[in-house]
Each structure stands twice: as C-alpha cells, then as structure tokens.
C-alpha cells in the first residue's frame, strides 16, 4: 500500500524586537497608566491631507514648571517616506526624514537633525535599522564636533529565545562607553528578560498575562559594589472595555495606583497617586492627572 505523504508547513518565523524594546511588555505595566506629580494634556489630530499633529503639555506640581511639545508628521506611503517636524518649549527645533522598505525590504534609514536658535547648538544623527526573520540590527551615528559616536545593536531570535547586544563607541575618546548584553524568552502570554549593563548593573523582569483581563509584571535590579537591590511588582486589570486599574509597589515601600477611563471614543482620562508607605502620615505623596484627546 502506498504511503500518503502529508506536507508539513514550516513553523512561522518572527522578527525579534530592537534591543531597546527587549522587556518592553514588563516595563509598560510599570510605566503606563501612571503620571505622578504631573498634570498632562495630549492632543492628536489628523488633517484631510494626511498630516498628523501631536501636541503635549505638562505641568510639574512640585516645581510648577510647564513644558510642551508640538509635532507634525506626514507620510508619503508611495515612496516609503515619513517627514517629521518637532518643536518644544526649550525652543529646540527638530527635523526627521525616514525612508523604509525602499532600498531593500526590512531596511529603514533616518536622518535626524536638531537646532536651538537660543544657543546656536546643532546636532545631527543618521540612524539605520534592518530587520528580517530571526534578526534585528541597528546602527546610529551621532555627529559631534569632538567626534562622532557610533551606537550599534543586534538582536537574534529563535523559537522564542532572544539574545541581544548593544554598544556605543566614542571616537573622541577611542573607547567603548557602553556595552550591554541581554537574554530573554517569550511566548504569547509570558516573557522573561535578563540584562547586564557595562558589567556592573544586573537586571531581570518577568511579564505574564494571567488571563484576558489581567497582566502582571515583576522587576529586579542590582548594581555591583553596592548592597542596593531594587525590586518591584506591578499589575493591570481591565475592568471593562473602557476602564482599567493599575497598581505597583517596590521594596522602598512606594505604592502607586492608577485608574484609566475612556470617557468617549478619542477621550481618555487617567488619574494616579503615589503613596510613601514608610511615611504615610508625613505627607509627600503625589497625585497625577492626564487627559488624552484624539480625533
């Protein structure tokens, strides 16, 4: 009897994230949904011609300092081009031009410049990123009068395992000023990340999606030569499609809580508070308020 051969489909390969995004899922649980000591307003709009406008303003309740940014972005999809103009209240102007998937598939080139009229300071940076199955590479050149600095990174992935390296070479000093290494593992609902920065800082994080509405994260960090170990636990619970609550606590007894509510499509309100558990009656606690508008 002839055997029936059934074709086996190869396991789909995925593109690993850039080095800066390793462990991002765990960091987002700790960072998003909180804004201690700030009153913040974010507005995003898009014109009929496709130009995107983003405006952000914040006031620090401790110092009273007010800061803001304005960004316009236009995408020329036919040629893979993106033009971005930036301005902030420090009176710094920025221009960014990016081209993606045109020279070759997976390659992105970015030209980034900034100029401060008050001081006359100028800066320029050329960024390159290349991503394919199992690999994500990046190389940036930061131009400076003393000499350019070269930032490089590489992340390799295979069957959920991730390994990455990040470095910075200062040509003015002719030496490596940054050398970081990371190893991790991720699945659909679980991520593990460990890293060593410059051989002195050791860190790790775990992210787990316990169920559809409940995410948890654990973070641990230690610096060699000190007895200081930093440890934190955070969680986010989606109450319903329009509301979520976040909470976190660390080994310094700092307790943070946040509540996010979508008031209507395009309008989101976030309230947050930070409580010092060691001096609960002494004050020094912080509140935060953020409003996001998008149209």
Curated annotation (Swiss-Prot):
<feature type="transmembrane region" description="Beta stranded">
    <location>
        <begin position="243"/>
        <end position="250"/>
    </location>
</feature>
<feature type="binding site">
    <location>
        <position position="24"/>
    </location>
    <ligand>
        <name>ATP</name>
    </ligand>
</feature>
<comment type="subunit">
    <text>Monomer, homodimer and higher order oligomers; formation of higher order structures is necessary for scramblase activity. Interacts with ARMC12 in a TBC1D21-dependent manner. Interacts with KLC3. Interacts with SPATA33. Interacts with PPP3CC in a SPATA33-dependent manner.</text>
</comment>
<dbReference type="GO" id="GO:0031210">
    <property type="term" value="F:phosphatidylcholine binding"/>
</dbReference>
<comment type="function">
    <text>Catalyzes the scrambling of phospholipids across the outer mitochondrial membrane; the mechanism is unrelated to channel activity and is capable of translocating both anionic and zwitterionic phospholipids.</text>
</comment>
<feature type="transmembrane region" description="Beta stranded">
    <location>
        <begin position="51"/>
        <end position="60"/>
    </location>
</feature>
<feature type="transmembrane region" description="Beta stranded">
    <location>
        <begin position="285"/>
        <end position="295"/>
    </location>
</feature>
<feature type="cross-link" description="Glycyl lysine isopeptide (Lys-Gly) (interchain with G-Cter in ubiquitin); alternate">
    <location>
        <position position="121"/>
    </location>
</feature>
<feature type="modified residue" description="N6-acetyllysine; alternate">
    <location>
        <position position="32"/>
    </location>
</feature>
<feature type="binding site">
    <location>
        <begin position="272"/>
        <end position="276"/>
    </location>
    <ligand>
        <name>NAD(+)</name>
    </ligand>
</feature>
<feature type="cross-link" description="Glycyl lysine isopeptide (Lys-Gly) (interchain with G-Cter in ubiquitin); alternate">
    <location>
        <position position="32"/>
    </location>
</feature>
<feature type="transmembrane region" description="Beta stranded">
    <location>
        <begin position="161"/>
        <end position="170"/>
    </location>
</feature>
<keyword id="KW-1017">Isopeptide bond</keyword>
<dbReference type="Pfam" id="PF01459">
    <property type="entry name" value="Porin_3"/>
</dbReference>
<keyword id="KW-0813">Transport</keyword>
<comment type="function">
    <text>Non-selective voltage-gated ion channel that mediates the transport of anions and cations through the mitochondrion outer membrane and plasma membrane. The channel adopts an open conformation at zero mV and a closed conformation at both positive and negative potentials. There are two populations of channels; the main that functions in a lower open-state conductance with lower ion selectivity, that switch, in a voltage-dependent manner, from the open to a low-conducting 'closed' state and the other that has a normal ion selectivity in the typical high conductance, 'open' state.</text>
</comment>
<feature type="binding site">
    <location>
        <position position="32"/>
    </location>
    <ligand>
        <name>ATP</name>
    </ligand>
</feature>
<feature type="cross-link" description="Glycyl lysine isopeptide (Lys-Gly) (interchain with G-Cter in ubiquitin)">
    <location>
        <position position="122"/>
    </location>
</feature>
<feature type="modified residue" description="N6-acetyllysine; alternate">
    <location>
        <position position="278"/>
    </location>
</feature>
<feature type="transmembrane region" description="Beta stranded">
    <location>
        <begin position="81"/>
        <end position="88"/>
    </location>
</feature>
<keyword id="KW-0547">Nucleotide-binding</keyword>
<feature type="transmembrane region" description="Beta stranded">
    <location>
        <begin position="267"/>
        <end position="275"/>
    </location>
</feature>
<keyword id="KW-0472">Membrane</keyword>
<comment type="similarity">
    <text>Belongs to the eukaryotic mitochondrial porin family.</text>
</comment>
<feature type="transmembrane region" description="Beta stranded">
    <location>
        <begin position="190"/>
        <end position="197"/>
    </location>
</feature>
<dbReference type="GO" id="GO:0005739">
    <property type="term" value="C:mitochondrion"/>
</dbReference>
<feature type="modified residue" description="Phosphoserine">
    <location>
        <position position="252"/>
    </location>
</feature>
<keyword id="KW-0406">Ion transport</keyword>
<dbReference type="GO" id="GO:0006869">
    <property type="term" value="P:lipid transport"/>
</dbReference>
<keyword id="KW-0626">Porin</keyword>
<feature type="modified residue" description="Phosphotyrosine">
    <location>
        <position position="79"/>
    </location>
</feature>
<keyword id="KW-0007">Acetylation</keyword>
<keyword id="KW-0597">Phosphoprotein</keyword>
<dbReference type="GO" id="GO:0008308">
    <property type="term" value="F:voltage-gated monoatomic anion channel activity"/>
</dbReference>
<dbReference type="GO" id="GO:0005743">
    <property type="term" value="C:mitochondrial inner membrane"/>
</dbReference>
<feature type="transmembrane region" description="Beta stranded">
    <location>
        <begin position="135"/>
        <end position="144"/>
    </location>
</feature>
<feature type="modified residue" description="N6-succinyllysine; alternate">
    <location>
        <position position="32"/>
    </location>
</feature>
<feature type="transmembrane region" description="Beta stranded">
    <location>
        <begin position="148"/>
        <end position="157"/>
    </location>
</feature>
<dbReference type="GO" id="GO:0005524">
    <property type="term" value="F:ATP binding"/>
</dbReference>
<feature type="transmembrane region" description="Beta stranded">
    <location>
        <begin position="177"/>
        <end position="187"/>
    </location>
</feature>
<feature type="site" description="Involved in ceramide and phosphatidylcholine binding">
    <location>
        <position position="85"/>
    </location>
</feature>
<keyword id="KW-0812">Transmembrane</keyword>
């Amino acid at each position: 009897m002839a055997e029936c051969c059934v074709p086996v489909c190869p396991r789909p390969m995925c593109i690993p994230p850039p080095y800066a995004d390793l462990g991002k899922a765990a960091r987002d649980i700790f960072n998003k949904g909180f804004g201690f000591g700030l009153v913040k307003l974010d507005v995003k709009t898009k014109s009929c011609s496709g130009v995107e406008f983003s405006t952000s303003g914040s006031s620090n309740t401790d110092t009273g300092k007010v800061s803001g940014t304005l960004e316009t972005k236009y995408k020329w999809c036919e040629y893979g081009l993106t033009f971005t103009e930036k301005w902030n209240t420090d009176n710094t102007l920025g221009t960014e031009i990016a081209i993606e998937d045109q020279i070759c598939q997976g390659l992105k080139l970015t030209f980034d410049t900034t100029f401060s009229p008050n001081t006359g300071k100028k800066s320029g940076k050329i960024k390159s990123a290349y991503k394919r199955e199992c690999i994500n590479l990046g190389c940036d050149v930061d131009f400076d009068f003393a000499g350019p600095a070269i930032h490089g990174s590489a992340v390799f992935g295979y069957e959920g395992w991730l390994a990455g390296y990040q470095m910075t070479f200062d040509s003015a000093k002719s030496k490596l000023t940054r050398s970081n290494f990371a190893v991790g593992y991720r699945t659909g609902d679980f991520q593990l990340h460990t890293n060593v920065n410059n051989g002195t800082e050791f860190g790790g994080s775990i992210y787990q999606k316990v169920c559809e509405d409940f995410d948890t994260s654990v973070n641990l960090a230690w610096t060699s030569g000190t007895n200081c170990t930093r440890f934190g636990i955070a969680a986010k619970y989606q109450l319903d499609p329009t509301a979520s609550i976040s909470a976190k606590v660390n080994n310094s007894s700092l307790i943070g809580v946040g509540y996010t509510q979508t008031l209507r499509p395009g309008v989101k309100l976030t309230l947050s508070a930070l409580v010092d558990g060691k001096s609960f009656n002494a004050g020094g606690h912080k509140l935060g308020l953020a409003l996001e508008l998008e149209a």
